[in-house]
Amino acid sequence: MAKKADLSVKSERDKYWNDKAVQVFKGRRIVSVRYMGDLEAEENMWSKRGLVLKLDNGMTVIPGMDDEFNDTGVLHYVNAEGQWDCLPSL
């Protein structure tokens, strides 16, 4: 049985979350992209409408403003020329 990560230790916490991100995203393909509707935001008591990404394995990804998902978040990206941009919450 593998040792459970001690998340109070920075190196173990970093490895745990990096491994989790790899498990969730590596090799996945985004099959649809949209902004959530007003009703979806209202049902979650959010003041803004965020992006909704659907992956090829059925998983839905919604950027959040914090770990408690108090509202939707933005998605920053860097293009091939190194220019930063952002897809905002609306």
Which role does the model predict for each range below?
Residues 2-90:
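Surface-exposed, interaction-prone regions used to assemble/regulate multi-protein complexes
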